[in-house]
Amino acid sequence: MGKISQSVSLGYLTRRIARKANIPFEEAPVGFKFIAEKLLHEGAAFAAEESGGYAWKGNQPESDGLVTFLLIAEMLINEKKNLSSLVANLEKEYGKTCFLRRDIALPKVMPNKHSFAVKVKKKLPKTMLGHKIAETETIDGLKIILENDWWLLMRPSGTELMMRAYAETDSSAETEKMLDLACKLAAVK
């Protein structure tokens, strides 16, 4: 089968599905070139990125919306269900998910994402929104993963006076709160 690979900024529904199916899962830096590398040289069967780019083993290592559409159409026909029913089934089995991104103005350019991540990591609380921090990753900025699979990713631009913050929880209200925390954490000197 192969593993599932996705950009670090993409939501965790894919991760939860892979976990339940015992399929290896990994993340890569933001940018299709990084997940294409996983398809070409590292045994990925499927790769995805936040902007809707999906690629499949055995095809071109490029974002392929047509193949993705055809696979979804085949699934709809085989399951004899409409798309909203399939989405409802996914939510029932794997939980609701709300993913949002926010661009946050910074007072100065932060060309080194890793040093930013190290500084913020030192100041992290033990819990966020009432949930323990389970792990942190520094693949591309700083990703904070909570014990319940909620997460926050902070990626300074490196060339602009801004940081992209991405978050996923089970509701829009909680996701907005997570992005508000990113604003506070980004103020760390």
Outline where the language-model segments fall:
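Phosphate-binding and adjacent anionic-ligand microenvironments
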Residues: 1-189
